[in-house]
Amino acid sequence: MSFMRRMKVELSAFFAGSSCVYPKHAPQPIKEDALLSGSLESTNRPYAVAKIAAIEMCSAYNRQYGTRFLAGMPTNLYGPNDNYDRNYSHVVPALIRKMHEAKTNGADQVVIWGTGQPRREFLYSDDAADACIFLMNLDDAGHRVWRDGVPCRCR
């Protein structure tokens, strides 16, 4: 950021945050103003704190130097080259893998873990890229924190 400011880069810069920056027990669906409103998930805390520091740095640079650094919080992304590992994938790739394996093995049902109560938001990776470009081209985007995604439950 410092280099971009010194070089007087006029285009926006986009910092991709993470949904882990929001409190563990934030009301669902999470709103932008939930940032810094409660305790973070302990297992993600160091990562979340680093992301929050970068978000704050974007805001500080914008106020002090008039830069156009944006912070976006992409929701749970899915798309090409996703991680389908049986033990480490996220919700959408895990569901795709389970459905594919069930069809391949001729299973008549698929077991989905959890209660179905937590709400998650999902966004296709190409749509996330389009949203980033759109936001960077806004003249009045300022230093707001931006989120995107569609809330849904997995049952």
Regions found by a protein language model. Give the residues of each.
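Catalytic helix-loop patch of NAD(P)-dependent Rossmann-fold dehydrogenases
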Residues: 6-7, 11-12, 20-78, 82-87
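Catalytic Tyr-x(3-8)-Lys segment
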Residues: 39, 114-118
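Short, conserved SAM-binding segment of the class I
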Residues: 2-3
